[in-house]
A protein has these predicted regions:
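Pyridoxal 5′-phosphate
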Residues: 1-133
Length: 133
C-alpha cells in the first residue's frame, strides 16, 4: 500500500508501473475539493489482488467496499483538478525544486541545522532537517 497524497500533482504517478497493490490519494493536495479521495486496487484477471473489508456496510455501491451515495460534484472536481495539475506537472516540479533548494541553501548557513538526504532521490517539495549533532 502506498499513500501517494504528497506525490500527487508533484510527480507523475503511473499505477501500471508502480509496484503497489493499493494506492490512495486526496484531491485537496491538487487544490481540489476537500474530503474527496481516490483508492486504487490492482486487479489481475479481473479480480482485485487484495480484498478489503467494508468499514461502512449497506447498499451495493462502490463494489461493496463502502456504502453511501457517491459525491459526484466532488469526484468531478477531483478529476478537473487532476487534469489541470497534469498540464503543469513539469513546471510545478521545477518551481518546487527551486524553492526547496533555496530553502536548504539558506538553512545550510546555520551551524545548528543539518540537512538530511541531499544526495538521495526525493520529491521536489520535501526537505528533511534535524538539529546538528
Amino acid at each position: 500500500m502506498s499513500d501517494a497524497t504528497q506525490a500527487l500533482g508533484k510527480i507523475s504517478i503511473d499505477v501500471q508501473r508502480c509496484p503497489v497493490d493499493i494506492l490512495t490519494c486526496s484531491a485537496h493536495k491538487l487544490y481540489g475539493p476537500k474530503g474527496v479521495s481516490a483508492l486504487y486496487i490492482r486487479q489481475k484477471r479481473g479480480q482485485r489482488v487484495v480484498e478489503l473489508v467494508p468499514q461502512i456496510t449497506g447498499g451495493g455501491g462502490e463494489e461493496g467496499i463502502r456504502a453511501g451515495t457517491l459525491n459526484v460534484p466532488g469526484i468531478v472536481g477531483f478529476g478537473k483538478a487532476a487534469e489541470l495539475a497534469k498540464k503543469s506537472l513539469e513546471s510545478e516540479r521545477l518551481r518546487l525544486q527551486m524553492l526547496r533548494d533555496y530553502f536548504e541553501a539558506e538553512l545550510a548557513q546555520l551551524a545548528q541545522i543539518k540537512i538530511n538526504g541531499i544526495e538521495s532521490p526525493r520529491l521536489p517539495h520535501v526537505s528533511n532537517v534535524s538539529p546538528a549533532a
